[in-house]
Amino acid sequence: MISAFEANCDGLVGPTHSYVGLSPGNLASTRNAGEVSNPRGAALEGLAKMRRLADLGLPQFVLPPHERPAVSLLRQLGFSGPDEIVLTSAWRDAPALAAAACSASPMWAANAATVTPSADAADGRVHFTPANLLTNLHRSLEGRQTARSLRRLFADETRFAVHDPLPAQPHFADEGAANHVRLCAEHGGPGVNLFVWGREAWSHWDGRFPARQTKEAFEAIQRRHGAARAVFPQQGKAAIEGGAFHNDVVCVGTRECLFFHERAFEDRATMAREVRAAASGLFEPAFVEVTEADLPMADLVASYLFNSQLLVVPGEDRLVLLAPVETRDNPRAYAVAESLATSNGPIGRVEYVDVRQSMRNGGGPACLRLRVVLTEAELAAANPAQRFTADLQDALADWITRRYRDRLSPADLADAKLLTESREALDELTQILGLGDDFYPFQRTA
């Protein structure tokens, strides 16, 4: 079996990180709308998490923010004039559109794409399909730039295939890896791919909150990637209604372990049976289920226990769960988390990480990263300038401290100076990460 590693590609928080409540069904986003954010603090929190993963011996990469404000969107919607006038006019006449154009949501890289490792793909390459994220306007802007970003990081087409997003049409609504789990005996060996969907394209959905992922989208991605051993369980309707807008709010898995809440799947028994059948002859899945009695949905969503990173750490026999500090601060979630370590199950210990700025918008540690299983050769073929090191951390921390504001209210997003500040910051970042001088739209039109 070829040796492989689960690399984490974390989204770097952008200069316009803010709380404007753009995401129906995301309870934290709605609750904190209107609050003052700290983009500098948020970006530094993200760096600290990346450093912890790197210190544990895990491959770590940095994905750049997207250009925001997205003036091109506002121009498409009828605003004209110099960029600064476009922005101020949009805030005056259509503030909801302007807010969407300013969102720093690409930081949540779990939604960047769905990934199939070379061990599972029909042609032996690593496949990526950037998510179209069409359920919410602010996120629907991301797919094309995400594809560009992934093609810079994984440029070798003999090893990597970065596809275009699926058609931007409701039948193919796709939210990326936040709804995908891969189980396996070893990262380099064959795995079972769980594509978790919320609704079928031709079925009526009458939920209070949107079901963002269609089954048809994941079926198309599975065909496109040639992903072997695919299972298509439905996400629990009760979970979506309770605020689990992606499956990674109620479920996380790696290697043989699937750690999930009892409401994560609409039909838990069928899911388990199909996963076992797909894994037959390869490995025995380990299902670690938490009941509603032990952790009610309200505490689950408040604590984000399952929006943790489940890690295979070199030198450790059991898995490590990297959870947000909100899990530690919630008595019921903390009791569940700590019970994992004292059990004889696959999860041996829990660490806690502070990503509060992201959490206030409904994004825990798992939201901030895209997992990519890579062999040694594939790892070596990735853009080395984006590989997280102590030197890169120092360079990015200096850049963030110089370029980012430490206070940003929703009203501040209308400041034309923020547009200039953001572009100057991103222009410098392209040099730090070796992205070239044509990475962002403003660079290509200068």
UniProtKB/Swiss-Prot annotation:
Record InterPro entries: AstB_sf, SuccinylArg_d-Hdrlase_AstB
Molecular function GO labels: N-succinylarginine dihydrolase activity
Entry binding sites for substrate: 20-29, 111, 138-139, 212, 248, 361
Active-site residues from the entry: E175, H246, C367 (nucleophile)
EC number(s) per entry: 3.5.3.23
Ribosomal protein found in the keyword field: no
Catalytic activity: N(2)-succinyl-L-arginine + 2 H2O + 2 H(+) = N(2)-succinyl-L-ornithine + 2 NH4(+) + CO2
Gene3D superfamilies registered for this protein in UniProt: Succinylarginine dihydrolase
Pathway where this protein functions: Amino-acid degradation; L-arginine degradation via AST pathway; L-glutamate and succinate from L-arginine: step 2/5
SUPFAM superfamilies, per the entry: Pentein (SSF55909)
GO BP terms in the entry: arginine catabolic process to glutamate; arginine catabolic process to succinate
Keywords assigned: Arginine metabolism, Hydrolase
Subunit note: Homodimer.
Family: Belongs to the succinylarginine dihydrolase family.
Function noted in UniProt: Catalyzes the hydrolysis of N(2)-succinylarginine into N(2)-succinylornithine, ammonia and CO(2).
Protein name per UniProt: N-succinylarginine dihydrolase 2
Name of the gene encoding the protein in the UniProt record: astB2
